[in-house]
Design a protein with these regions (language model features):
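Redox cofactor-anchoring modules in respiratory/redox and cofactor-processing assemblies
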Residues: 1-161
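Iron-sulfur (Fe-S) cluster-binding segments and ferredoxin-like electron-carrier domains
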Residues: 81-104, 108-109, 114-118, 125-144, ...
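Glycine/serine-rich phosphate-binding loop and adjoining beta1-alpha1 elements at the start
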Residues: 177-181, 186-259, 325, 345-392, ...
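Beta1-alpha1 glycine-rich phosphate/pyrophosphate-binding loop at the start
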Residues: 179, 183, 188, 230-234, ...
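Glycine-rich dinucleotide-binding loop and its adjacent helix/turn
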Residues: 241-260, 322-327, 332-334, 364-427, ...
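Feature captures the FAD/FMN-dependent oxidoreductase FAD-binding
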Residues: 261, 266-270, 318-367, 470-482, ...
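FAD-site-proximal beta/loop scaffold in flavoenzymes
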Residues: 375-405, 492-565
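A conserved FAD-binding loop/helix module that cradles the flavin
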Residues: 561-592
């Protein structure tokens, strides 16, 4: 039957052996009872316990195979004797018992070695591997005794069991691109910055970019937080990329790029933003022909024309772009708008097409008398296009022609709105106000602590719990806004607090420009109507979120067009997965996932980080390093990069705070 036979996961003890079906206990955790498709899991074993789904489990073989995975890892690491030699002994003894050659003294030795590893290993992988093994030895003792007393091998499931393992970390699991964060931090700590960059580019080609403008969700899952404060993970990422650029090194790829295949297979990608570039990179590394079609005259998508120079210098981003375009298999065509008719042509001509275009239509604020054609009404995307095309590429004219000496009101609460208000300051606006429906904590959660406080320092006025009710004009231009105030009223059912309008609390703001930045929408006119593509309730393109195939055979989607407006790192993570699936689909016509990708999904559902965990064996109180920022009076009048990054000494000191929280997980199927 399906269900959990036995579990010690995260100190949850379930033992359903010998119980009637109706009395079986259930787990509160999303354990992988089903591996993939119709394939059920027999067991899951990892850093925080073991879960058994098959009553006929071979516990001895399960423990032995788990130890084998760790032994292979520890041989490659070798940074501490308890981890390396302990892992060797752990595996040798378990393998000996599984072969029917063990003794009870071996069991005693196993327990002793396990306790030594748990208390003296330098990193978490050595400390945690023994836990599920000890659980199996305690609760499946009869199987161990049978192998020893009868000197007979364990059952080995008659040879029909496969063991699939994955090494992860809480930060890696939380990263949408699943970057091997402990590895690149280790490269910084060891001052081998090329190793750091190599670890990043395994799953993240845009190292310059995501070392600067990533919202770093990984830091929310940093175990160091349970001790004092999270590692400055994002800022350490840029060290390797900057080192490569500053020293003019040859491109460092995660693997030697394969020559262009001559089998005629080719993939079209629509959009040269983070999603399109990422998919092209990983397909191009495999030698698969990729043609990118980009509507804009420049490469890079919204990061190029939407993210300001002071946050993401175009020279650095261009290095990430050049890394992709340097590949023999990748080409790009600019000023090429793909409409529905052209998409049909590409779909017929190419073996697969991936949609990777961004959400570039600004949504309205839904206020009375809102007219997008009124003077002073300026969509956030159009405004940022003008700013960045001028400052980065000298295309068009300065936005200061419009904004200098003016009062600007922006409605938003995310990264785009932050870019709007901070750019307005730099373009000479007299007064800049952001209206946001919720509170300060929420805007920080939507963006970053640094982004919000830097905007405040630069003179942006934030008015929280507010929204525009009506827009006034003189027939040609916006003149003022009527703004309502709201208060948060707790939900009596314990849900999210609701915003309730404060009667009589409205007020007026005189302004010259209203720039809505509440969200963006997709231009879905690219999709042929007769394809009847399935869409989400947010009017993005529906996929299953795993292989990124749309309802149209051979058409994939990743990034904004699949999910709606998303962060760069999310787009990278989706596009890397899509590229992996496409690389197999164009040859066998099937959408399949690798075991590593299946395990990624299982671990992400399970959640690797445990915010309730109490950390022992580490000294708290090591302060988080803060990078130097350009002084406010200097930065708010120009577009120089604000975040100057760490010095070498600061970076090494911060990297030394990393606890190297690797874990091994394994599924038996």
């Amino acid at each position: 039957m399906s269900g959990i036979v036995f579990s010690t996961w995260r100190d949850e003890f379930i033992d359903n052996r010998g119980k009637p079906d109706l009395e079986w206990g259930k787990s509160e955790f999303k354990l992988p009872e089903t591996y993939y498709g119709d394939t059920n899991s027999k067991a899951f074993i990892g850093w925080d316990g073991v879960a058994i789904f098959d009553e006929d489990i071979d516990a001895v073989e399960l423990a032995s195979q788990y130890a084998a995975q760790y032994q292979e890892y520890s041989e490659a690491c070798g940074r501490c004797a308890p981890g390396r030699w302990g892992g060797r002994i752990l595996y040798d003894l378990l393998d000996k018992i599984a072969r029917g050659e063990g003794t009870h003294d071996d069991v005693a030795h196993l327990k002793e070695i396990s306790k030594t590893m748990m208390t003296t290993s330098k990193c978490e992988i050595g400390k945690t591997v023994p836990k599920p093994i000890l659980d199996l030895m305690e609760h499946y003792q009869e199987q161990f005794n049978t192998c020893i007393d009868a000197q007979m091998p364990s059952k080995h499931y008659n040879g029909d069991t496969s063991y699939i393992a994955k090494v992860t970390a809480p930060c890696t699991d939380m990263c949408p691109a699943h970057v091997d964060i402990p590895a690149y931090i280790e490269g910084v700590r060891d001052m081998v910055f090329t190793d750091s960059l190599a670890a990043t580019r395994q799953t993240m080609p845009l190292a310059h970019t995501c070392g600067r403008v990533c919202p770093h969700p990984c830091e929310d899952a940093c175990r160091r937080t349970n001790l004092d404060s999270p590692i400055s993970i994002m800022e350490l990422k840029r060290l390797g990329a900057d080192y490569e650029t500053d020293h003019e090194l040859p491109w460092l790829h995660p693997a030697e790029p394969k020559p262009l295949r001559n089998d005629g297979k080719k993939v079209a990608i629509i959009g040269a933003g983070p999603a399109g570039l990422t998919a092209a990179y990983y397909l191009g590394l495999e030698g698969i022909k990729v043609d990118i079609f980009e509507e804009l005259p420049v490469n890079g998508g919204e990061v190029a024309v939407g993210v300001p120079e002071y946050r993401m210098p175009i020279g650095k981003y261009q290095k990430d772009i050049d890394l992709v375009l340097e590949l023999e298999a990748v080409s790009i065509t600019n000023n090429h708008r793909v409409d529905a008719a052209r998409l049909k042509e590409l779909h017929a001509e190419y073996d697969a097409v991936m949609l990777g275009f961004g959400a570039r239509l600004s949504k309205k604020v839904r206020a009375a008398n809102e007219n997008v054609n009124m003077g002073g009404y300026w969509g956030a995307i159009d405004m940022l296009d003008k700013v960045n095309l001028w400052h980065k590429y000298q295309i068009g004219s300065p936005a200061s022609n419009e904004l200098n000496g003016k009062t600007v009101v922006c409605v938003g609460g995310g990264f785009t709105s932050m870019d709007v208000v901070r750019c307005s300051i730099r373009e000479g606006a007299k007064k800049v106000i952001m209206l946001y429906r919720r509170d300060e904590k929420t805007i920080i959660r939507n963006t970053t602590y640094e982004e919000y406080h830097e905007a405040v320092e630069e003179g942006v006025e934030f008015i929280f719990h507010s929204a525009i009710e009506e827009i006034f004009d003189d027939g040609e231009n916006i003149t003022k806004l009527k703004v309502n105030r709201f208060e948060l009223v707790p939900d009596p059912n314990g849900g999210r607090a609701q915003l309730v309008k404060i009667e009589g609390g409205d007020f007026e703001i005189e302004c010259d420009y209203l720039i809505p930045a509440v969200s963006q929408a997709l231009d879905t006119q690219i999709i042929p109507e007769d394809w009847n593509i399935e869409m989400t309730s947010w009017n993005s393109i529906l996929t299953n979120g795993k292989d990124f195939m749309t309802s149209k055979e051979g058409l994939f989607a990743a990034g904004d067009c699949e999910y709606g407006p998303m962060t760069i790192v999310n787009a990278v993570g989706q596009a890397r997965r899509a590229a992996s699936v496409i690389s197999r689909y164009i040859y066998d016509g099937k959408c399949t996932l690798l075991d590593d990708e299946i395990m990624e999904d299982h671990l992400n559902r399970l959640r690797v980080y445990d915010k309730k965990e109490k950390i022992t064996g580490w000294m708290p109180g090591l302060p988080r390093a803060e990078s130097e920022k350009l002084e406010v009076n200097e930065r708010k009048t120009n577009n120089k990069e604000v975040n100057l990054g760490f010095t070498g000494e600061e970076a090494i000191s911060e990297a030394e705070r990393c606890m190297r929280c690797y874990y091994i997980s394994m599924v038996a199927v």
